[in-house]
Regions:
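Residues in the short beta-alpha loop(s) of Rossmann-like NAD(P)-binding domains
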Residues: 5-7, 113, 190-191, 212, ...
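Active-site-proximal loop->helix
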Residues: 11-20, 77-78, 118-124, 288-290
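Phosphate-binding loop of NTP-binding sites
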Residues: 24, 30-37, 44-189, 193-204, ...
Length: 305
């Protein structure tokens, strides 16, 4: 395995320690790696004039983008979850990792941030359970094969690619329809654009969650302790578990409701899912509290939006 990146990081150093040959710098070319490669996988951020892509084409080496590669892997799993949405993908994927690992399902996980539980952003399991973030940028998630498509919210983003919100909604609708006849869509019912995504989608199996009782999954008896919520999870009017979160904010109530809903569809009961969710204390660079400076709280949060 070989590759290149702009900068050295903990992830690339980990790969190097495992034997990967990596070169660094803008426009870096791992010529030796390309010469030996039978397949070149590139990120959506790498354009056609990237020197390694140009070299691979010249040598007739097969090229596929990361989404297509991940989709090809995903296709082999009986239970495959694609976690999509403008916000909340990494956090919800991480919550699912905690819940499914806690349920001893030995899942394969691909997450967009570093999660301490799995020692990075990838976990290779030996079961039929696969969970990955599903990003809409360049319509990447349309190359996936989800049996469960989770949509946390839909807003204007990646406007260097999409023309506007209507095109984004259309893309998410195509993603939802990847589950037609084979699985489920789990959707945040209170989001107006998610509602547009699923408008008249009567031929899909849709499970909703939100803050109101009109949705399939919703919270009751919410209490905050220093910003950290605890609440009862209700499913179609019945309490199925209680969750005491170790991450702050109402948005994480929604993320945990989505996690319980997906877990239920994968055969994990709500109580077991709740125990796993409660062990989740956040991922790196997702509203990560780093400490204090001159009396101010320092938060590290990675975001384009």
């Amino acid at each position: 395995v070989s590759g290149s990146d702009w900068n050295k990081s903990a992830i690339t150093e980990k790969l190097e320690n495992m034997g990967a040959d990596i070169v660094y710098g803008h426009g870096a070319v791992n010529e030796d790696g390309i010469n030996k490669a039978s397949l070149v996988v590139y990120t959506a951020a790498a354009k056609a004039d990237n020197p390694e892509i140009v070299l691979a084409k010249e040598k007739g080496i097969r090229l596929i983008d990361r989404a297509e590669f991940l989709g090809a892997i995903m296709k082999n799993y009986k239970h495959a979850v694609g976690v999509s949405g403008t916000h909340g993908k990494t956090t919800t994927t991480s919550m699912l990792a905690h819940a499914l690992i806690g349920a001893n399902l030995d899942p394969t996980i691909s997450v967009g941030g570093e999660l301490d539980l799995i020692g990075g952003n990838i976990r290779t399991g030996k079961s039929d359970y696969f969970v990955t973030e599903a990003c809409e940028y360049t319509n990447s998630f349309l190359k996936f094969y989800p049996t469960i498509a989770l949509i946390t919210n839909v807003e204007e983003d990646h406007l260097d690619f999409f023309s506007g919100i209507d095109e984004i909604i259309a893309s998410f609708r195509q993603f939802a329809y990847l589950t037609k006849d084979i699985g489920y869509v789990v959707a945040m019912g209170g989001d107006k654009n998610v509602q547009k995504v699923l408008e008249n989608a009567d031929d899909l199996n849709i499970i909703t969650y939100g803050m109101e009782s009109k949705f399939d999954y919703y919270p009751e008896n919410i209490v905050y302790h220093a910003g950290f919520p605890s609440f009862d999870v209700m499913k179609n009017g019945e309490k199925v578990c209680h969750i005491k979160l170790n991450v702050p904010g109402e948005h994480n109530i929604l993320n945990s409701l989505a996690t319980v809903a997906v877990c239920n569809l994968m055969g994990v009961d709500a109580e077991t899912a709740a125990k796993g969710i409660e062990t989740f204390k956040g991922t790196h660079r997702r509203f990560e509290k780093k400490g204090f400076l001159n009396g101010a709280v320092v938060i590290d949060d990675y975001a384009h939006h």
